[in-house]
Structure formats: C-alpha cells, structure tokens
C-alpha cells in the first residue's frame, strides 16, 4: 500500500514533536575488542595520550594509541574481567605513584602498590611517572665517586654520582651480582637505592630481597617488581616508576643509585605492546621509537645543581647479550645513551675470575674525575699493566723461551687478576682498596707466590680494619683523600711486615725463586 503525501507529512510532524535532544557524552566510550591485555575503545574523542581510562569502575588502562575511530588502551590489571561492550570512562589523570622516605624498605609493583604484605604506604606525596628529564642548565658535571666496593670497577672503571653506567654481558655472568654488591656497599654512605626487576622470576626477586635484608640494605632500598608472570604494560611501566621514586630524593638534595634489571626484557615488553597495538615494526621487530623509550628513561639520571635540589641519580642499567654480541640493536642503543659500560664475559666467569669483568672492553666516560686523588694515583697504570699481560699471555702460547721482562709482566699480571677476584656480597671500602693497589703499584707483592696472593689480600683487609695503628693510617686517607710521602711510607712498612709474615709461614720458601721487593721500599723497614 502506497503512502499518501498527507500520511508522510503527519509521520514527520509526529517524529519532530517527539524528538528529544540528547547530549553525546564523549567522556564515556565502549570496548569494541579486548585481548592480550589490549582494549580497543570507541567514543572517547578528547582523550589524551598517556591518560588513565577506567573500565567498569574497577580496572584501569593506559592510553597508548590515538586513532581516528578508536583508541588503543593497555590494560593495567586482569583483562579477563572485561568484555566487548563494556563501558570505558576518562579519568583526566595520568599515572602517578606515592613517593618519599616511606617507600624505603618496601616492595611495590609498577603502579606503586605494595606487594610485600606490610600494609599501605603511608605517604602523602604523589608524582607523575612520565616526566621530562632535567635540562642542560639544571645539571652539574659528575665529580664525586660512587663507590661500588668492587676492586675492578672502583680502580679502572670508576662510577660517579649522576652517571649512567651500563652492565652488559651474557646470561649467568654475574651482572645482577655486581649491581646488588653496589647496593650493599652504599650502607652508611647516605645513598638511597632503587632496584627495578623487569621480567624476573618471582622467586629470584624474593631471593634478592632476602639478601638485601640480611645485609641491612633494605633500610635504604626500595624494590619495584614487574615479574615475568605480569602483563607487558606492567613490565613497560616498572622502570619509570623506579626513576620517579628516585627523582623525589634527588630533588630534596639526596644521592640515589637505581638499577634496571634488565632493559632487554623492558624492550621486549614494549615490542609486544607495540605489535599488539598494530604499530609498524622496524629492525628486529622493535618499533621505531625504541631508542626514545630508553633515552627518555636514562636521561632522567643526572647530577643537578643546587637550584634544582642538588642531588643525583646514578643509573646502572643491565643488558643481556647473546653469545657476547654487543653489536645487537638494543645493546648498541643503550651503549650510545650511557656514559660507559662494564662488560662481563662468560669465559672469564667459567675460568673462576669473578666478578667476570673484561677490563679491556669496559670503559667509564667520566673517568678519573670521579675518583679521589689517592685512588687515581695508585691505579693510573693498572689498566695498561693488564693490557700488557693479556697481550703477552697470547704471545707466550707460541714459545717457552721467554725473557725476564716478559716473565715479570706475566707473573705480575696473574697476581693482579688474583687480587681482583672477589666473593659476592663482600664489598671492600675504597680506602682499603687504595692500600691494596699501592702494594701492586710499588711491586711489593713480588716475593709472594701466586697461590698465597689471596691470603695476602685477606691479611691486608683484616689488618687495616682491626689494627689500631693501621686503622689510623686508613682514616688519614679518608680525611685527606690523597697520599702524602710520609703516609705512603708508613702504609708501605705495614704491608712489607705482612708480606714477611706470609713468606715465613710458607714451608720450603726460597726468596731466590721470586723477585724481591724494590730496594727503595725494602729500605724503609730496614731503617726502622
């Protein structure tokens, strides 16, 4: 039946009469798809990048993609609670966390929520986790040492407060051990520490927390954990949460050490997120902005001037390599961002040289400006001595006829490497280190057989930490930060006495089988 004009006109009039003006709310949207921790949401036209979205009044998400018809949201919680058609609301807020001294001694997740069962964090201070790094004019040059307690690092690869020093190497070569030892060594030095675990096993993180507690380090340390069982968005956010906690301390004039363990897993988490958000992949399937991902994070580590708080953040990012390949994409990215790298080598680790630091490949671009004068003086030629030793070691494989100077280089080098060996969780203070390296520099270790070098090292550490006279000399180094001729001579006398005690205790020891102590130092004891 055809409609007449009159009927059409009455229908239109009826529709106009009953029409209600409804305001379209562009602050509330709908989930159009959900999966793998990513939700696509339509209807939120004015949302900002990095803004928090709330689903069903309970689950939060982070806006990462802004498309014409929909937005991509990373779910920060259990995505199984969501389904297509669920409501999504803007919060008009970006992610912020609680910061301040109350967070020390606690284990938190990437959202700043406590996961250690010790109750809520009682802090009123909140900070946004995505912030711009301090500008050039807000910074100061790095000129103060951050002692790690590790002989090889403090002598040849010195780290300064405000520096970014990469720890890079294959898996199971002691990278985390170096970082944990550095944290333990900050006890009593008024340095706050943050350990960020990205993609680690929960059991590994629990073990690290226990070790820090056993050594009294949790008093000044906070642990941020985004374990392997958590979704990619949480692993992506964890390092930014860690550095945000550190920035609060830096801006109140305090020094902070932050460890990112590790940024390889962080890059993988970001790659996963990017691929799920349908961003175009680049080299090794990483997105084009993966360099910026790490540069914006590591540039937040700095030594700032007094107008900006006067504190510092020292960063120790960790990168895992495959088969010692430091030319991989993420490895070269982070090497170019940081101020040097500590390279751990599997062959050294397996040969018993621990920490397994390859001194030849490792470098600190801050250099000796971060060392006290005494350390600078006694370690100036150490790297060269080890380079000569490694060169001669390769050369000596081809022939047994070696001259005396080559034998001396090989013997001295092997003794230095023996002194550089160090057990985990046993950091040595930098003033005791100065004394050990003085013994090397002055060739006082000549008469000691290689197998007794570790005994000599223990004797010196014990002597200069227990004996009143020796302890007084160490205090003078701490106060003056340099070695006067008189102080050097007094320390040399004590070292020679300890060497004599060791050689006397060796059965069938023949001094003629070993090079003597240089005459100028031997005289000091004889003339006493």
UniProtKB/Swiss-Prot annotation:
E.C. code: 7.1.2.2
Residues that, per the record, bind ATP: 169-176
UniProt site (Required for activity): 362
Chief localisation class: membrane
Catalytic activity: ATP + H2O + 4 H(+)(in) = ADP + phosphate + 5 H(+)(out)
UniProt xrefs under PROSITE patterns: ATPASE_ALPHA_BETA
Localization terms from the record: Cell membrane
UniProt topology in membrane: Peripheral membrane protein
Enzyme superclass (EC): translocase
Subunit structure: F-type ATPases have 2 components, CF(1) - the catalytic core - and CF(0) - the membrane proton channel. CF(1) has five subunits: alpha(3), beta(3), gamma(1), delta(1), epsilon(1). CF(0) has three main subunits: a(1), b(2) and c(9-12). The alpha and beta chains form an alternating ring which encloses part of the gamma chain. CF(1) is attached to CF(0) by a central stalk formed by the gamma and epsilon chains, while a peripheral stalk is formed by the delta and b chains.
Family, similarity comment: Belongs to the ATPase alpha/beta chains family.
Role played: Produces ATP from ADP in the presence of a proton gradient across the membrane. The alpha chain is a regulatory subunit.
UniProt-recorded name of the protein: ATP synthase subunit alpha 1
Native organism: Mycoplasmopsis pulmonis (strain UAB CTIP)
Gene label: atpA1
């Amino acid at each position: 039946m055809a409609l007449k004009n009159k009927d059409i006109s009455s229908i239109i009039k009826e529709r106009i009469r009953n029409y209600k003006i409804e305001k379209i709310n562009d602050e509330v949207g709908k989930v159009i798809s959900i999966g793998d921790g990513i939700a696509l949401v339509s209807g939120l036209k004015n949302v900002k990048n990095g803004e928090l979205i709330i689903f069903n009044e309970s689950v939060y998400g982070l806006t990462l993609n802004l498309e014409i018809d929909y937005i991509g949201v990373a779910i920060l919680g259990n995505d199984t609670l969501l389904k297509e058609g669920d409501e999504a609301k803007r919060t008009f807020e970006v992610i912020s966390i609680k910061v301040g001294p109350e967070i020390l001694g606690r284990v938190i997740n990437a959202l700043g929520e406590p996961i250690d069962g010790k109750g809520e964090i009682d802090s009123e201070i909140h900070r946004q986790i995505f912030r711009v790094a301090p500008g050039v004019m807000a910074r100061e040059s790095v000129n103060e040492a951050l002692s790690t307690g590790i002989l090889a690092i403090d002598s040849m690869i010195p780290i300064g407060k405000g520096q970014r020093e990469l720890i890079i190497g294959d898996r199971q070569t002691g990278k985390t051990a170096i970082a944990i030892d550095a944290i333990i060594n900050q006890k009593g030095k008024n340095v706050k520490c943050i350990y960020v675990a990205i993609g680690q096993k929960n059991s590994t993180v629990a073990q690290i927390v226990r070790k820090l507690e056993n050594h009294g380090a949790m008093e000044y340390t906070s642990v941020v954990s985004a374990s392997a069982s958590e979704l990619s968005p949480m692993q992506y956010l964890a390092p930014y949460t860690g550095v945000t906690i550190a920035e609060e301390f830096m801006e109140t004039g305090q020094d902070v050490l932050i460890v990112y363990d590790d940024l390889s897993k962080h890059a993988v988490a970001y790659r996963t997120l990017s691929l799920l958000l349908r961003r175009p992949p680049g080299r090794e399937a990483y997105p084009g902005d993966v360099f910026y991902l790490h540069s914006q994070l590591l540039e937040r580590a700095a030594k700032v001037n007094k107008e900006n708080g006067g504190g510092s953040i020292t960063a120790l990012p960790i990168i895992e390599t495959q088969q010692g390949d430091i030319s991989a994409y993420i490895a070269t990215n982070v090497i170019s961002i940081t101020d040097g790298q500590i390279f751990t080598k599997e062959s050294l680790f397996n040969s018993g040289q621990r920490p397994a630091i390859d001194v030849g490949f490792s470098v600190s671009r801050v250099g000796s400006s971060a060392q006290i004068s005494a350390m600078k003086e006694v370690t100036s030629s150490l790297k060269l001595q080890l380079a000569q030793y490694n060169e001669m070691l390769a050369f000596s494989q081809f022939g047994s006829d070696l001259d005396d100077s080559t034998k001396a280089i090989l013997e001295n080098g092997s003794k230095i490497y023996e002194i550089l060996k160090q057990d985990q969780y046993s950091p040595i203070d930098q003033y005791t280190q100065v004394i050990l390296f003085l013994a090397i520099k002055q060739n006082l270790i000549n008469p000691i057989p290689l197998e007794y070098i570790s005994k000599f090292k223990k004797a010196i550490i014990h002597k200069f930490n227990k004996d009143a006279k020796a302890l007084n000399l160490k205090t003078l180094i701490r106060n003056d930060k340099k070695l006067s001729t008189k102080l050097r001579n007094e320390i040399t006398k004590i070292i020679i006495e300890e060497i004599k005690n060791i050689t006397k205790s060796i059965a069938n020891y023949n001094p003629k089988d070993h090079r003597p102590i240089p005459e100028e130092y031997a005289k000091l004891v004889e003339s006493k």
